[in-house]
């Protein structure tokens, strides 16, 4: 999650990079600041770590973000209990939040 990390990834021709732990290292503001010099190369990011329903729209609205991930989509207790319907509902809610920003 540093410019040096991005440079190393580019050496390997990687253009999609994990941005972790997103919120702990400065969130979307930090991501957008480090992304600027690489935009012309088509580098995109997948923020993880601290992404939540409350900041999902901000992240997904950024042109630097390809996708997001978060443990809130499949909390451990729901996985352990096999509550796939609840996990599906959380995923559907996330999709609806994001769709609302693109329509």
Which residue stretches match the model-derived regions?
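Glycine-rich phosphate-binding active-site loops on the catalytic face of alpha/beta enzymes
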Residues: 6, 18-27, 63-86
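Catalytic cores of alpha/beta
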Residues: 3-12, 35-36, 51-66
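Generic structural signal for well-ordered alpha-helices
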Residues: 6, 28-31, 56, 88-95
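C-terminal helical cap(s) of enzyme catalytic domains, especially alpha/beta-barrels
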Residues: 77-103
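Short beta-strand/loop segments at the ligand-binding rim of alpha/beta enzyme cores
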Residues: 38-47
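A charged, well-structured terminal subsegment
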Residues: 25, 32-37
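Active-site beta-loop-alpha junctions enriched in small/polar residues
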Residues: 1, 22, 46-53, 71-73
């Amino acid at each position: 999650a540093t410019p040096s990390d991005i440079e190393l990834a580019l050496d390997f021709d990687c253009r999609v990079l994990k941005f972790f732990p997103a919120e702990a290292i400065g969130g979307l503001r930090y991501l957008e600041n480090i992304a600027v010099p690489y935009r012309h190369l088509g580098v995109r990011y997948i923020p993880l770590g601290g992404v939540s329903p409350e900041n999902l729209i901000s992240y997904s609205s950024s042109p630097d973000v390809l996708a997001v991930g978060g443990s809130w989509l499949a909390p451990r207790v729901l996985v352990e209990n096999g509550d796939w319907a609840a996990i599906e509902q959380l995923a559907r809610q996330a999709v609806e939040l994001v769709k609302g920003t693109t329509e």
